[in-house]
């Protein structure tokens, strides 16, 4: 594993130094099976699980036998709320449930690092000093800058939580998804063609990742 070095791009079209991407985060082996498991678990946990149907015991009415047992020539019936009646209860229908799956933190971290490594190897990670020059938000400037970085349509923009200027500038751009460094996850990385980090967000993410690794070793 080797550290990767990326130039820091500016909104003016120049470079402002470079940053190193640690190999333990951005040059890891990719396990497709692990990515699949973690993404499925993340999507499952996002489900509300509030779906609910009524059984024959919960549907209003149907307490009286609709007609006598014998002598009508019809099949015997005990309630008009049985599942085979229109307006009857639902048999084996969905009930509220929790879809969350237990996924170990080490697996979640390994999947995220694998997804980032895949994007880094394919030169789909970019680092910028700031999205928009100056103090005023500008969607036009943000759009032009991102289009200069990549021609692909789906972009994940990772910025600092306090970078309100960048948030307002990119909030309405189609194909651009905004996350803070501590919100970075496997699904959003894989769902985007390119990842654009601000220098601040990149350092925050790396510090959190390396700090957590040191705590685990201790």
From Swiss-Prot:
Cellular component terms per the entry's GO annotation: ribonucleoprotein complex; ribosome
Record's signal peptide: none
Keyword presence, Ribonucleoprotein: yes
Disordered: region residues: 46-100
Comp. bias intervals (Basic residues): 62-73
Entry GO MF terms: rRNA binding; structural constituent of ribosome
InterPro entries listed in its UniProt record: Ribosomal_uL4, Ribosomal_uL4-like, Ribosomal_uL4_dom_sf
Keywords per UniProt: Ribonucleoprotein, Ribosomal protein, RNA-binding, rRNA-binding
Single GO BP term: translation
One Pfam family this sequence matches: Ribosomal_L4
Primary role: One of the primary rRNA binding proteins, this protein initially binds near the 5'-end of the 23S rRNA. It is important during the early stages of 50S assembly. It makes multiple contacts with different domains of the 23S rRNA in the assembled 50S subunit and ribosome.
Homology family: Belongs to the universal ribosomal protein uL4 family.
Complex and partners: Part of the 50S ribosomal subunit.
Name this polypeptide is given: Large ribosomal subunit protein uL4
